[in-house]
Amino acid sequence: RELAERLLTFPSPGRERPRLLALHASSHHTSNTMALWAQVQSRLSPRWEAEEVGLRNGTLSDCSGCPYTMCLHFGERGGCFYGGVMQEAVYPAVRRADALILMCPNYNDALSANLSAFINRLTALFRQTRFYEKAVFALVVSGYSGSDTVARQLISALNMNKSFYLPSNFALMETANAPGEALASPGIELR
């Protein structure tokens, strides 16, 4: 609820319905992170226009470290050497979005491989587009601990490195293990 309220009070960039891009690499069936997202998303309508992009099952190749000039060459043309879902779906969605929300299950105190690949591959788009006017939010679910570590990774990668701005209390962090456990946490409907 609190995260939804923060999104609802997000300053509109001159649009009646700001655009929110939700990125995840999780299974809807078993994911506590996605269950929390469904709860947050249900509170956003009709004020926000939300678009969801899934980055799982081998759809996203990580950056392999192109030379700077090659990354710059493709980035200035709105693409990336590796193409795929990043160039076809993610880059256009990031361009349209006023804010991003990342669903981040905590895997060993780190972002998932697919979300890390998203951040790495965002560099090519950053060559052409600055993100100063785009906010970043997060849902972080950990089995035991480390949500703060994952949130710090997002701050470092997206706020400090890629220039997304960081609203106060940008992340909802929860601890859950078994599927559905996050929604049973005391007071979760208020956070």
Residue ranges and their predicted role:
Residues 49-58:
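A short beta-strand-loop structural module common to alpha/beta enzyme folds
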Residues 1-47, 62, 79, 162-191:
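Glycine-rich phosphate/pyrophosphate-binding loop and the adjoining helix
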Residues 25, 55-56, 104, 122:
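Fold-independent oxyanion-binding glycine-rich loops
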